[in-house]
Every structure is written in C-alpha cells, then in structure tokens.
C-alpha cells in the first residue's frame, strides 16, 4: 500500500486470520499502526507548502497501486443528497435550498470530464494532518479515499485549509493557497485544463461539504456524541468561489 511507497501514513496490519479487512458488529474494520504527533489548530503558509508537496507525493506514488474505488461523494451524489434536505434548512440561511439547487445546476454544466485522475485522500481537513515538533508527520483517516480528479483534492484543501476565521467570517488566505499549490507543483505540475477548471472544482468541493453539513444539521440527533458542524462556514466559502472566476485568483 501507500506506506510501502514511502507515503507518510499509518500502515494496515493483518488480523490473526491473515485479513486486512474484517467485520466488527457487522461493520467493516481494519487495524492500522499508530501515527505519532497530532493535528495543529491552524496551519502556517509554510505548513501549506509542505502539505501540498506531500499531496503531490501521494498522487505520484498511488499511480503504482492497481486498486479502484468510486467516489461515493462525487458530483453524481449531490443531487440525491439535496433532495433529502428539506426546507427547514432555510432557517440556517434564507432561501438556502434554492441557492444550493442553483449552484448544483451551474456546477454540473461546467464540471470537467477529462482531467487527470488517480487515488486521492478525499478528506484532507486539518485534523487529518499530523505534525510532531512542528514537522509534518503524515496523514490519517482514509475513509473517503477514492479515485477522482487529482486537482479536486487540491480544491478540497483550498476550502479546508486556506480560509482564516475572523469572528463569523471566513477570509480567503491567498498566501496559504499559493503555498499549497506551489508545494504540490514541486512534485506534480497542474496542466492547462486543471487550471482552467480550478474554480469550478473549488465551487464543487464547497458545495459538497455544504450539502453534507446541511444534511447532518437536520438529521443528527441533538444528543449525538458527534459535534454537528455549522453549514454557514461553507455558505461563506461558496460565496467566495462564486465571485472569482480564474485560477489566478488562487495563486500569486
């Protein structure tokens, strides 16, 4: 797997029966090695370069793996998910349901068809990136890992890592975004089409997380152990991507 290809991540371990995958209480499970370090509360621009570089390494190394998994949260899943979100979501933001519907239709029309694909992590939020003594240590939580557009991974990271929260606003940090892309391109260059469609990939990623957060907001029991994440964060991020049109808006 990835660990043998020198990608910094936990390594799967076989159980006593020699299987990597098995079931616990009818759910799929696996055992992995422990990864030292922990996540940071906020990444610096320098950290973003290192993260980008290691995403590039992941994408390059994963070409050698002959495994395939469809993205269960790809653009084709967003419509059915939107249909499950009822009008109560408009309490979060006025006319939100219609706004998401409009965004989805527009993004679907503009969504690319032939960008370079490969294995992506698919959920690289700050709590899945580990550091030890300020040094990058590796990635965890490959639950959403799948085959998809490689540039879509960067779009997810732009949304997850390159906005600064100030009060109730989320301000785009172009320095972090630039470093993330530069770090990535130190290993793998983006081609012209990936740059051309970069904005729509960022919009799509923001909508995907807005949809899942909106659904969870309405359907997670109030006494659930998991913390419900605020959909408003991704309303604001989606607004930013609507206002910009070009790859140059993401890089200095």
Identify the function of each model-found stretch.
Residues 1-67:
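ATP-binding pocket architecture of kinase catalytic cores
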Residues 5, 9-13, 19-22, 30, ...:
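Structured catalytic core of nucleotide-sugar glycosyltransferases
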Residues 12, 105-152:
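Active-site acidic catalytic loop and adjacent metal/ATP-binding pocket
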Residues 29-42, 83-87, 207-224:
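A glycine-centered beta->alpha junction motif in the catalytic cores
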Residues 42-95, 117, 225:
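A cross-family kinase active-site recognition segment
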Residues 151-189, 204-221:
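Active-site activation/catalytic loop segments of kinase-like enzymes and analogous catalytic loops
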Residues 192-202:
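All-alpha amphipathic helical-bundle segments outside canonical DNA-binding/catalytic cores
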Residues 209-252:
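ATP/Mg2+ or Mg2+-diphosphate-binding catalytic cores
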